[in-house]
Amino acid sequence: MTFGRIGAGLALFSLVTALACGAENQARSNASASGAFTKGGDDRTGPYEVLEAWWKAAPDHTDGWTWGSVSGVAADTPDRIIVAIWGDQKAQRQERPGGSNYLVVVNANGDIVENWSQWDSLFNRPHQVYISPYDPDRHVWVVERGGNGVHEQILKFTNNGSELVMQLRDPQSVLSREEARANLNPGPLDFGQPAVLAFLPDGHFLLGDGYHNGRIVKYTTDGEYVSEFGSVGSGPGQFDLVHGIAVDKNSRIYVSDRMNHRVQVFTEDGEYIEEWPDIYDPVAIFIDESDAVWVLDATLNRMLKYSLAGELLDYWGAYAEVSSLGRSGWPGGMSLPHQMDMDEDGNLYIAEFGGPWLDKFVPKSGADPTRLIGKRQLGTN
């Protein structure tokens, strides 16, 4: 009796499986007949295509000199893209970066239209560059990590680069990791390799500080200290290399805790909410109007899409080396992606620190809109 029931159950299971497989095969056959799929492909650039040879050599690159590491990008308009670079370097990287070409502006075709060389003496390692989405005057902000006689600082320029309007400068020379972390109560300007800025609707801004200090510091629009949260460590609310910050429409703060391989989420007052673990090397966070949280992973060379709840929804991207190893890359290949931004036309820009180059990604014709990065999500006062 028991064997009979088992046999009947197996027969029923086989019938259901056969019907399911038949339905799946029929669906594939129908898709093939209707041309509903594209043969081949590896989705390396996701829903975007890359403008090949868009990033160009500087006019003064001669005698084997090329760009240093491209560290930051801010899209002012689709025809005005501000780029931060670690100066120049020899093409084969035998020498440290030279003291020029730290901030340049390119147009929609990638042509250099401005070089802010008048400010070269302020820079050694410009880390990232920003324009606050809440600022009608479109000031340009730069986080400088310092070194080689340059102090760590936060710099704010007029949009055209003609004037330096604010400078938050660490009075000390750059400290080592051990020296910085020995100071358990750093002051408002005791920077520890500052890394990232994020802006709030009321004009205040957040500083991720950074490589050596484990804290998020809030300042007024004029650079006055307001508050801070965080400490060095791996527990909830602690950090080991704050490298990316984004704020959603509900004023929640998302922080890429790079060396702890996670994103942490906080209230606007810095109260810990949760962590998203097992994100290998998160370096930048961008939240769009559809509530998608986009995370750039530098080691995986990948763009990751999450929900506001932390669910992984999609990803794309792949590594591509260039001529420094004697082999050519391919358009859109990533090499230690470092910062990203979007322009008003939906084009994506990624600063490739290991390239060194800046990539411009444009949406593919007919791309699935759910896979495209939308406009930046803004908060309310």
Q: Which residues fall in each region the model found?
A:
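Bacterial N-terminal signal peptides
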Residues: 7-18
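Generic extreme N-terminus detector
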Residues: 5-6, 346
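Eukaryotic scaffold repeat domains enriched in small/polar residues
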Residues: 23-381
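N-terminal secretory signal peptides that target proteins for export/translocation
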Residues: 1-3
